[in-house]
Amino acid sequence: VGVCCGYKLCHPC
């Protein structure tokens, strides 16, 4: 559980 930030996107995971 946390935050995944990739190519110009952030979402909970």
Curated annotation (Swiss-Prot):
Protein name, as recorded: Chi-conotoxin MrIB
Organism (species): Conus marmoreus (Marble cone)
Keyword Disulfide bond attached: yes
Function (record text): Chi-conotoxins inhibit the neuronal noradrenaline transporter (NET/SLC6A2).
Entry-annotated residues carrying 4-hydroxyproline: 12
CC annotations in GO: extracellular region
Other information: Exists in two forms, due to cis-trans isomerization at 11-His-Hyp-12.
Keywords recorded for this protein, A-Z: Disulfide bond, Hydroxylation, Neurotoxin, Secreted, Toxin
Entry annotated with the keyword Disulfide bond: yes
